[in-house]
Every structure is written in structure tokens, then in C-alpha cells.
Amino acid sequence: MKFDRHRRLRSSATMRDMVRENHVRKEDLIYPIFVVEKDDVKKEIKSLPGVYQISLNLLESELKEAYDLGIRAIMFFGVPNSKDDIGTGAYIHDGVIQQATRIAKKMYDDLLIVADTCLCEYTDHGHCGVIDDHTHDVDNDKSLPLLVKTAISQVEAGADIIAPSNMMDGFVAEIRRGLDEAGYYNIPIMSYGVKYASSFFGPFRDAADSAPSFGDRKTYQMDPANRLEALRELESDLKEGCDMMIVKPALSYLDIVRDVKNHTNVPVVAYNVSGEYSMTKAAAQNGWIDEERVVMEQMVSMKRAGADMIITYCKDICRYLDN
């Protein structure tokens, strides 16, 4: 009987390493940090074990730890002292993220700062834009100028990449126009253009204090049941000038990561979101899984699906890679 002997290429660890198709590197990782304006706070987020809200005055130690591990890309999320109905704190000169960015750039010039460009952390209603008084929904076109102001303010503070996440129609085009007019034509846009209205975001909203005070975000984030819609969003953002595309969430949407990869030649970013991280942590803390092996399998699955970069809360990946 003749048959194929596939096991020949699995015969030893060295052989398996040699023929491995996908690899996870420290250079692939973008690490989120939650920054609060209050002093002397380092508070573990209950629903995100191992992740902390950190004060501006304590930020340097967190940045040093991440940098020493080999992380070279950071994404800041702000928890401001005060909020209003239009998210003013997102774009003021001394906003919490602007201050954090200046601290990071002063410490490490080669640390890439990816700026999450949204309003939800700064609005008193928790939505991602200006609320229309009549429809009680986010007003798409009135929100766009505020996003542009936020992006420019973030770049002025030292951000290297703008990552708009509020899923307004036309947000890439308007931000690109605004950056170019301000002379920042070399700043790339990493669009959250394929972002689903997912239940996996829950722990993040605890961490960033950004849960909507009414309703939900289903009128601007995508339906988890839809696949072709992701390609329409991708096509629009590419036309508008995005340089990289985020798929969020990642693990339950690996088919979408592959679709996006197959339909574009720009880098694809998988966001390993808070709920995915927390489920893994909970299972590991109960002794049900081997955390290191499961995390690395998750990472390589995202790379295999087509992700060029991964946004992850798990900085321990760097330690795993060192081992």
C-alpha cells in the first residue's frame, strides 16, 4: 500500500522548527496601557488580571518594563478625571494621552506610539461621538471634526501612528485630510475599519471606564453575523487612505482576518481583545489550561490567519519567546 509519509517532517523539534510556516516575534506585538490622570494609582483591573490602570506619575516604570521585555509599540488608552458630552479631553493639549505620549517619547525615541483615536473614553455618555438630540444616536458628520482634532493633537504630542476606532463613516478620509493639511502627511493611519459590535469587549470597558450609559454601539459597529460587510468596510478605508487595517476582535473572527489579508496588500492587525485575554487568564488560574502554550497557540493562529501584527494585553509573550 502506497501512502504519503507526512510524519517525516515532524520527526524532531529541530525538523519541526525548520519547516514551521508562521512565527510570532516581539516585533509583531502592540501593547495597550491604560493611563489615569489621578496620581499614585497602580490598580489591577479585576476583569483583566495582570493589567493595570496606571497614573501618569508612575508610567515610567511600566514603560521601562515593557521596553526591557522587547516591546517596541505601545497603544495608550486614557482614563480622564473629567468628561463632557463631546469628549473634549480627547483633543486638548494636556489630555491624559497627550501627556503619556510625551513621557514615552522622552524616555524612548524608538518606541512607536499608536494613538487610539476615539471619543468614548472622554464622553460622559460613553458613546464614540456627538449624540444627536432627536435620534439619540451618534451624529456621524458632527463627530468627524472632533476626531480630526483628536488625531492632530495626538500627533503633535508625538504619536507615530493614528488608529481611529469609532467606526464613523468617512473617518479615515477626514483624518487623512486633516493630517495632510496640518503637514503630517507621513503619519500612517491604522484603521479599526473592521470592528464588530462584540460581547468580547466587556473587560476593556471596565478598564477604560467607557461603557455606554444608554443603548449600545450597534448602529456604528458591525454585526458579528456579517462577513461581506467587512470587505465593504475594507474597500472604503483603502480608498480613503488607510495604511493598515485592524480586525477586532481576533480569535472568533479569524475567517475575517484571512478575508482581509486576501483582499489587500496593506498590513493586517489582529486585536486580541480583552474578553479573549480574560477567558484565557481565568482558565489558567483555575488550572484548566497551560497558559503559556495556549497563549502562544492563539498568537500563532492569528499569524496563520494572516495577521502581520497583534494587539495584545499579554506582555508575558515576550518572556515566553525568550524561553
From Swiss-Prot:
Pfam (any one): ALAD
Listed CDD domains: ALAD_PBGS (cd00384)
Residues that hold 5-aminolevulinate 2 according to the record: 274, 313
Protein name per the record: Delta-aminolevulinic acid dehydratase
Subunit composition and interactions: Homooctamer.
GO biological process: protoporphyrinogen IX biosynthetic process
Transferase recorded as keyword: no
Reaction equation(s) it catalyzes: 2 5-aminolevulinate = porphobilinogen + 2 H2O + H(+)
Binding site for Zn(2+): 118, 120, 128
Keywords tagged on the record: Heme biosynthesis, Lyase, Magnesium, Metal-binding, Porphyrin biosynthesis, Zinc
Homology family: Belongs to the ALAD family.
EC main group: lyase
Function: Catalyzes an early step in the biosynthesis of tetrapyrroles. Binds two molecules of 5-aminolevulinate per subunit, each at a distinct site, and catalyzes their condensation to form porphobilinogen.
Organism: Staphylococcus aureus
Cofactor annotation comment: Binds 1 zinc ion per monomer.
Name of encoding gene: hemB
Superkingdom of origin: Bacteria
Enzyme active site: 195 (schiff-base intermediate with substrate), 248 (schiff-base intermediate with substrate)
GO molecular function: porphobilinogen synthase activity; zinc ion binding
Chain residues that bind Mg(2+): 233
Residues engaged in binding 5-aminolevulinate 1: 205, 217
